[in-house]
UniProtKB/Swiss-Prot annotation:
Binding site for Zn(2+): H227, H229, D240
Region (Disordered): 1-64
Domain of life, per lineage: Bacteria
UniProt short sequence motif JAMM motif, positions renumbered to this chain: 227-240
Organism name: Burkholderia pseudomallei (strain 668)
Similarity-based family: Belongs to the UPF0758 family.
One Pfam family this sequence matches: UPF0758_N
Top-level taxonomy: Bacteria, Pseudomonadati, Pseudomonadota, Betaproteobacteria, Burkholderiales
SUPFAM superfamilies for this protein: JAB1/MPN domain (SSF102712), RuvA domain 2-like (SSF47781)
Protein's name in the database: UPF0758 protein BURPS668_0979
Keyword check for Protease: yes
Molecular functions per Gene Ontology: metal ion binding; metallopeptidase activity
Length: 278
């Protein structure tokens, strides 16, 4: 990863029923239906609402099964596709909701990539309109906010696992480089999280002076910074180490401590502090 460290002067056919009742021989008008026929007709009628095709009722029962299992056994009992299907609610003509969920997961490659997708990423996808896009984006934002609340409850230095989870959800699967700052108070509790720089796959301009200025404006006593590697490899580069030194020294001039710098991938993180590099 290369940095530009910038100084102050640079700125669902719901499946259609295909079965057809076999034509019964015509009975004389005086014929009385047998008790077996009456029982069969009663059971068939009770099996579905009046006017509903048999396949529609079956599809409805199929959608209900994951919901019932979730309520009875918890969300861990469901597959990724089943959980996505519950969010989507219904399918398309020719494709039930579970087929749509599988299609989405295949399109994005993983559940994490699906949930980290931006609204524009869903444009043109059959069956995913504005309402479903909003639901998928909102779910991830709720998770981020919940983790941020957790980070505010106690000092982040006492809960490194919470920091890892938060950062991976925040930037771990971004397709481009993002530099993020976690501004902390004197007790090392989270005050605010801000994305302070965005780059390409291999290069990003970072402004240490602007980060210091923002820390002073928020009355922060300490900082944790992080950036992602879209490749997934979290080993820091020489440029990563140089940036960390420059930022640490700039913050020290105004008595603000740089606690850690994380390099973040989709499934792993690297901590400068744990490596003894800060």
């Amino acid at each position: 990863m290369q940095y530009e460290i910038v100084s102050a002067g640079e700125d669902v056919d719901d499946e259609r029923a295909r079965g057809r009742r076999a034509a019964a021989p015509a009975a004389p008008s005086s014929a009385v239906p047998s008790s077996a026929a009456l029982s069969s007709a009663a059971l068939s009628s009770a099996a579905r609402p009046t006017g509903a095709p048999p396949a529609t009722a079956a599809a409805r029962r199929g959608r209900d099964l994951p919901r019932e299992r979730l309520l009875a056994r918890g969300p861990a009992a469901l597959s990724d596709a089943e959980l996505v299907a519950l969010l989507l609610g219904s399918g398309l003509p020719g494709h039930d909701v579970f087929a749509l969920a599988h299609t989405l997961l295949a399109r994005f490659g993983s559940l994490r990539a699906l949930l980290d997708a931006a609204p524009d990423d869903f444009k043109g996808l059959r069956g995913i309109g504005p309402a479903r896009t909003a639901i998928l984006v909102a779910v991830v934002e709720l998770a981020r906010r919940a983790l941020a609340e957790k980070a505010r409850e106690r000092p982040l230095v006492d809960s490194p696992g919470a920091v890892d989870d938060y950062l991976r959800l925040l930037i771990g699967t971004r397709p481009r480089e993002v530099f993020v700052c976690l501004f902390l108070d004197a007790r090392h509790r989270l005050v605010q999280t801000e994305e302070t720089a965005h780059g390409s796959l291999t290069r990003m301009a970072v402004y240490p002076r602007e980060i210091v200025r923002r820390a002073l404006a928020l009355n922060a006593a300490a900082l944790i910074v992080a950036h992602n590697h879209p490749s997934g490899a979290v080993r820091p580069s020489a440029a990563d180490r140089r940036l960390t030194r420059v930022l640490r020294d700039a913050l020290a001039l105004v008595d603000i401590k740089l606690i850690d710098h994380f390099v973040v991938g989709a499934s792993d993180t690297f901590s400068f502090a744990q490596a003894g590099w800060i």
